[in-house]
């Protein structure tokens, strides 16, 4: 995400605007001087610091490698970088960047997560019961996503929550575990989630809860969405 996905500046629906229109087929390629490794059958099959990062609209962020470092792995040439090729993500068993295992795609150097303590209010109700009503929150500003509030468990009626088997992964916040709300026999699955072991930049929300407005009655005091001057509300 970030540059070409979501509402990133090079996406088809940017949050901001440029002085002149950008071409629809715009591709941004840049050096990515980090150690990237690929493991297959227990063997390191790629180990390079010469990868490129390719940002292409409607495509996941991807690495391009010098053709001479990919061996017999399947590959396709990168038209915007002669001599470089793409290797399918599932062609190997594991990808590493600077020793960190990657799950879905490369981490985006333009993606940022800011966690700020705030006094913005959050009220969450499920089946008529209030789970949280507090202004002691942390607001998370994440590139290309809407701001979101998190709260520590001490201000939540956690007795009405129980863990589910759902788990998801974010390249920037880590693994999320989910919670169901149980209120007088009514069960709403995956109404909340927590990141129990986030990376250092997200430690302010470690163990904190955020709630899904599509599954609960959530009233959150969030910043107004920005828009270009002259656009109608």
Which positions does each model-derived feature cover?
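Terminal leader/tail segments of proteins
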Residues: 1-233
């Amino acid at each position: 995400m970030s540059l070409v996905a979501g509402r990133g500046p090079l996406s088809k629906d940017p949050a901001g605007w440029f002085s002149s229109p950008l071409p629809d087929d715009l591709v941004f390629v840049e050096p990515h001087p980090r150690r990237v490794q690929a493991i297959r059958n227990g063997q390191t099959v790629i180990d390079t610091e010469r990868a490129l990062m390719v940002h292409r609209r409607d495509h996941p962020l991807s690495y391009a490698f010098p053709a001479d470092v990919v061996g017999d792995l399947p590959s396709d040439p990168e038209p915007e970088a002669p001599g470089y090729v793409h290797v399918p993500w599932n062609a190997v068993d594991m990808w590493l960047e600077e020793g960190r295992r990657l799950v879905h795609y490369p981490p985006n150097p333009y993606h940022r997560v800011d966690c700020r303590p705030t006094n913005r209010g959050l009220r969450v109700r499920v089946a008529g019961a209030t789970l949280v009503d507090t202004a002691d929150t942390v607001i998370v500003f994440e590139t290309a996503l809407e701001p979101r509030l998190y709260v520590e468990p001490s201000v939540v009626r956690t007795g009405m929550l129980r863990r589910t088997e759902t788990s998801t992964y974010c390249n920037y916040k880590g693994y999320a575990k989910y919670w169901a709300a149980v209120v007088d026999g009514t069960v709403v699955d995956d109404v909340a989630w927590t990141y129990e072991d986030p990376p250092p930049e997200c430690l302010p929300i470690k163990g904190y809860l955020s709630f899904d407005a599509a599954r609960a009655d959530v009233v959150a005091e969030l910043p107004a969405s920005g828009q270009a001057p002259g656009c109608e509300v």
